[in-house]
């Protein structure tokens, strides 16, 4: 069997992807993702897996719509489904690279949720991983960040899988060329305007090889850290389905080496953001929690003492997102909550923060209540699912599903390297 198909099949086995498991494939139109699309399409045919290609039209370049159509056309030629996901709305004038990445993932995650596909394949390869290490090291990242990208990582509606994380991009290009797959080179990948583009023009092969080797070392360390963190959570943490967290005060009397990391991850999940606050800020918070702490805010969260020697962590009201409407299926994602309604027309309904006190017999800290998701019809309060408040016949369910869940010992090592 040729190198890439065999490599892909072994990676899928390592990821626990079985016959019949649906696969979503993120394809930009570059050589690496086109190779991924071909490998996934062939694998799907052999193993009876549904394969759906997802390509994002980001609208940042005049060619982006045509490039997305190019991907969809090749998906059809390979006999797999495809969808073009469009980033609508205004584009930022600064921080474009980061904003584009965040919107791309948001569109991909929502498509996986809508299509009920739990496995999202990404085409990152060995050089991408090495470049990520070098960029993070230049920014002063610690051991956690220097592990680079994970081979497997959970998100709200499934898993991100990177089967090619240990393979050279030259081998992916050769595979694409052998199969007659035309690709598009994104000019922003080579421009000096962006950090990765600058790195690609300056990093040597030896530097990249050593950087990748270092990600394997730090990946092993990160996995050990996450295993210790999981044990810490089991002992000291209660994460409520209402989106707040309670930590036992005794957690701050220990000399647990993962305490700052564990606390940062809790803040990230409660705030429903991609990254934890800066390490120094979290370490300062740990010091305060160990000595006469009265309360503070950090990373979009509020932290305060709670009765019976506990600490309450909940969403800061000013950091809550704006109201969102339901899609045509009656689904909305708001502030880390997956909200679904049915049983009545919902065109005029929105999800927003309750933003007011409300008497309830449900056992919930009063300070948390205004931050809970609520359903409004033309600004009139109708339902607060977590509190049992209901003023119409509509059925509603709200599940706390942060974009990236609390640490679950992701796999930071590539399944195979070539």
Regions found by a protein language model. Give the residues of each.
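Long, contiguous hydrophobic alpha-helical segments, chiefly transmembrane helices and signal peptides
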Residues: 60, 146, 172, 199, ...
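Regulatory helix in c-di-GMP signaling enzymes, encompassing the GGDEF I-site helix
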Residues: 100, 203, 376
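A generic secondary-structure micro-motif detector
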Residues: 60-61, 97-98, 161-162, 189, ...
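ATP-dependent adenylation/nucleotidyltransferase module used to activate substrates
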Residues: 1-135, 170-171, 177-178, 379
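Flexible helical/loop "lid" subdomain adjacent to adenine-nucleotide binding pockets
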Residues: 118-119, 125-275
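Residue-level detector of secondary-structure boundary/capping sites
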Residues: 31, 62, 91, 99, ...
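AMP-forming adenylation/ATP pyrophosphatase catalytic core
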Residues: 4-9, 13-31, 50-52, 87-89, ...
